[in-house]
Regions:
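Accessory nucleic-acid engagement/destabilization modules that flank
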Residues: 1-239
Length: 239
């Protein structure tokens, strides 16, 4: 399945965009955007893993059998009423890998939450609600969804080797170090209370989220309108 896994089907002529192409290209764009804050590796990982759940057989069978669908709508509903969640697999993979770092201090866990929330939110109108009305952590329900619903194990088995290898390379110490450099001024400021620190961490998360959203939409739009892609590239060139 890995070689021919599909990400999108072009409305104009039915041309298929391979999932590996969408993931690698979105990763590059997201990395370029996040590099503005020296977080290029973070942006790359977000772009690479945002649609990891599309490697599931359920999703591939669905996109190949149905026309006129929106392949970027999360929680597709099959004719039998079954939903297909294609974003949480990437959430769980990133959270699992990053939380290994600085476990005693909870640093990797924090970064895993930040990136996971970005991926979980990438087809909504903004970041998902992280707390419920009583202040309880709502995000953990998404992160802890069963494998039966997220298909993480299946996606790891089906995914292109190039995607998995790059993901493992990105989710390492250099990425953690870049995030540490970004949050250190926030967390080390003794004059700032915790609520303000959490606000600034939220701002950083929103920046990363915007990098992923822009990259995903740019790549999807370029695939739908190839002529537009060339115009955009020309516009990016300096005079």
């Amino acid at each position: 399945m890995a070689k021919d896994a599909i990400a999108h089907v072009r409305k104009l002529d039915g041309l298929q965009q391979l999932l590996i192409d969408h993931l690698l290209e979105t990763s590059t764009i997201s990395g370029q955007l996040a590099a503005k804050l020296n977080l290029g590796l973070v942006g790359e990982l977000l772009g690479l893993m945002h649609d990891f759940g599309k490697y599931s057989q359920d999703f591939q069978e669905y996109i190949k059998s149905v026309t006129g669908i929106n392949p970027d709508a999360d929680d597709y509903v099959l004719p039998n009423g079954k939903k297909i969640d294609h974003s949480t697999a990437g959430v769980q993979w990133v959270y699992r890998e990053l939380r290994k770092f600085g476990a005693a201090q909870g640093i990797g866990d924090l970064f895993g939450q930040m990136l996971g929330i970005c991926i979980a939110s990438h087809h909504g109108e903004g970041l998902i609600d992280c707390l419920d009305g009583e202040g309880n952590p709502k995000w953990i329900e998404r992160f802890n969804k069963t494998d039966e619903l997220t298909h993480l194990a299946e996606c790891e088995q089906n995914a292109n080797e190039a995607v998995q290898q790059k993901a493992k390379e990105l989710a390492g110490e250099n990425l953690i170090r870049s995030l540490l450099n970004a949050v250190k001024p926030i967390l080390s400021d003794q004059a700032t209370n915790n609520k303000i620190k959490e606000f600034y961490l939220g701002c950083l998360t929103r920046f990363l989220f915007s990098c992923l959203i822009d990259a995903d939409r740019i790549n999807s739009s370029d695939f739908e309108r190839e002529a537009q892609k060339e115009v955009r590239r020309l516009a990016e060139k300096p005079d």
